[in-house]
C-alpha cells in the first residue's frame, strides 16, 4: 500500500504589523507518515519536542485526517483506510502555526496520493480551515509570504527573505488559544492606528527582503498586539524589553511565543529569558515536502 512521508515547517504570522497577512516559515518540523490501508483509521502520535501531545485526538477529528479527507474529496479520491504516524516537534497553542502545519500536511498528502502537483487550490483548501492564509501559506510555500483575500479566494505570494535575517523564538510554557486571543480584539480601531500599521506592514515587506536594518521600525504595530497583551503578560514584557535593546521583536501569531528577527541569531545577554525556551530557528526555504514510497 502507498506510503507518504511528509515534512512540514512551523510558521510565524503577523510579524508585528502584518495581521493575517505576513508569514515566515521556520525550520522546525512536524513529520508525518501516512499509509493507505485496506480499511479503518489508526493514528499514532509521538512527541519529539512539541511539549506534550496528550490532547491530540486519535480519531477522525485529528486535523491532519480532516484536511486529508477534504483534499481527497476535492480531488475525487476515496482511500479505503489510513494509518497515520505523527512525529510532533512544533509546540501546540504557542503561536508557531501547529494547526496550519497539520492542515497543510493533510492537503499536501491528498495531492501526493492523487499524483498531482500543488496548485492554487491547495492553499485555498488549507486556508479555509484557518480562516486566513498567512500561516498556511508559509508552511506550504516556505520563505516569507504575503497573503490576502480576493472575495472568498485566498491568495499568497512567496518572497525571498534577506539572507542576513536569523529568527530567534522564545517559547514559554504557557499555551494560548487563537480563538480566545482574537476575542480580545476590538471590532473597530482608530483610523490613525490603522494608517500607522498599514505603513509599517508595507515597510516590513521591504525590511524583510532588502533592508534588515529597518526591522525595528518595520515590526511596530498598533492593530492587535497591545489589545492581547493581557493574555500573556510575560511575553508582552519580553517584547518590550527586547525592543528597548534594539531587537525587532513581536508576538508570534496569536502568541504567546515571542519572535525576534535578528542578524546575530542570539538575544541580548541583559534580557531576562529564564521562563522561556529560546532557540534560533532559520527560515525554512522550501515549505512542505512530500515523498511517496
Which residue stretches match the model-derived regions?
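Short beta-strand-to-loop capping motifs
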Residues: 149, 172, 260-264
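DPxDG-like acidic metal-binding loop motif
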Residues: 28, 96-118, 140-145
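Short beta-strand segments
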Residues: 7-9, 25, 139-141, 148, ...
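Active-site rim beta-loop-alpha module in soluble metabolic enzymes
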Residues: 169-230
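ATP-binding N-lobe of GHMP and related small-molecule kinases
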Residues: 1-94, 115-116, 280-293
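Alpha/beta catalytic cores of group-transfer enzymes, especially the acyltransferase/condensing modules
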Residues: 117-165, 242, 249-251, 255, ...
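Glycine-rich, charge-dense phosphate/pyrophosphate-binding loop(s)
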Residues: 207-293
Amino acid at each position: 500500500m502507498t506510503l507518504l512521508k511528509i515534512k512540514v515547517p512551523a510558521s510565524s504570522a503577523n510579524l508585528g504589523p502584518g495581521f493575517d497577512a505576513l508569514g515566515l516559515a521556520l525550520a522546525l518540523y512536524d513529520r508525518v507518515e501516512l499509509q493507505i490501508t485496506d480499511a479503518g483509521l489508526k493514528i499514532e502520535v509521538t512527541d519529539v519536542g512539541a511539549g506534550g501531545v496528550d490532547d491530540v485526538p486519535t480519531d477522525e477529528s485529528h486535523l491532519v485526517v480532516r484536511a486529508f479527507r477534504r483534499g481527497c474529496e476535492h480531488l475525487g479520491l476515496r482511500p479505503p483506510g489510513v494509518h497515520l504516524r505523527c512525529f510532533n516537534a512544533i509546540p501546540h497553542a504557542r503561536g508557531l502555526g501547529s494547526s496550519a502545519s497539520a492542515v497543510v500536511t493533510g492537503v499536501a498528502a491528498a495531492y501526493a496520493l492523487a499524483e498531482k502537483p500543488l496548485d492554487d487550490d491547495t492553499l485555498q483548501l488549507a486556508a479555509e480551515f484557518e480562516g486566513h492564509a498567512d500561516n498556511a501559506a508559509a508552511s506550504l510555500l516556505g520563505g516569507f509570504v504575503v497573503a490576502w483575500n480576493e472575495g472568498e479566494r485566498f491568495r499568497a505570494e512567496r518572497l525571498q527573505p534577506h539572507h542576513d535575517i536569523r529568527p530567534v523564538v522564545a517559547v514559554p510554557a504557557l499555551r494560548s488559544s487563537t480563538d480566545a486571543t482574537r476575542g480580545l480584539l476590538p471590532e473597530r480601531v482608530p483610523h490613525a492606528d490603522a494608517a500607522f500599521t498599514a505603513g509599517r506592514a508595507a515597510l516590513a515587506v521591504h525590511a524583510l527582503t532588502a533592508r534588515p536594518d529597518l526591522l525595528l521600525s518595520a515590526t511596530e504595530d498598533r492593530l492587535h498586539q497591545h489589545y492581547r497583551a493581557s493574555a500573556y503578560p510575560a511575553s508582552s514584557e519580553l517584547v518590550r524589553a527586547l525592543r528597548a535593546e534594539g531587537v525587532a521583536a513581536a508576538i508570534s501569531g496569536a502568541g504567546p511565543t515571542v519572535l525576534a528577527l535578528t542578524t546575530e541569531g542570539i538575544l541580548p545577554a541583559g534580557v531576562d529569558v529564564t521562563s522561556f525556551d529560546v532557540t534560533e530557528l532559520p527560515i525554512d526555504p522550501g515549505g512542505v515536502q512530500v515523498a511517496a514510497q
